């Protein structure tokens, strides 16, 4: 009943080249817990009354009156959502993510990229509000061990297994 946003979204398989850039863009919000409104007061009081030693973010879904149309190149259009989500929660989450990340995806910078206020490139360059340019290279785009979104953990598991095998081989030398 209290999923992290990361647990209910993942990049659609046909768009998997965008997984790394989208992971970087959405990482902070992906680690946010979705709390139903009936539990929001208790959750907020618990956060206020307890020192948890970690950063915790919660969000309480609001009602959304209309369905939002997404550009096919938008970040949100490249996401799949868990089918177990109730329709109202799904509608809210799509709108919430689009509001936070209205970015369009571009293979590389160019004229159209320059004319768009919110953009994301395959190399992980993020342009927000036409003036904030960011690139977080704290981990490689292809490094699935740092990915948090998705219910299919096989890419992350494979990366971790490969790393473990490599480390064991180095130790055995």
Predicted regions, residues:
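Hinge-like oligomerization/junction regions that interrupt long coiled-coil arms in large cytoskeletal
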Residues: 2-166
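Extended alpha-helical coiled-coil "stalk/arm" regions
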Residues: 166-173
């Amino acid at each position: 009943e209290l999923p992290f946003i990361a647990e209910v979204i993942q990049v659609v398989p046909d768009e998997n080249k965008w997984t790394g850039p989208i992971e970087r863009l959405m990482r902070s919000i992906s680690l946010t817990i979705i709390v139903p409104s009936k539990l929001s007061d208790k959750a907020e009081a618990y956060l206020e009354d307890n020192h948890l030693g970690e950063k915790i973010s919660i969000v309480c879904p609001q009602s959304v009156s209309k369905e939002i149309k997404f550009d096919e190149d938008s970040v949100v259009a490249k996401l799949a959502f868990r089918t177990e989500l109730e329709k109202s929660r799904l509608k809210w989450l799509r709108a919430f993510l689009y509001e936070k990340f209205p970015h369009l995806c571009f293979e590389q910078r160019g004229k159209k990229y320059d004319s768009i206020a919110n953009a994301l490139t395959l190399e992980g360059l993020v342009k927000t509000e036409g003036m904030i340019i960011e690139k977080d290279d704290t981990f490689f785009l292809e490094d699935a061990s740092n990915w948090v979104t998705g219910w299919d953990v096989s890419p992350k598991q494979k990366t971790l297994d490969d790393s473990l095998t490599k480390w064991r081989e180095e130790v055995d030398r």
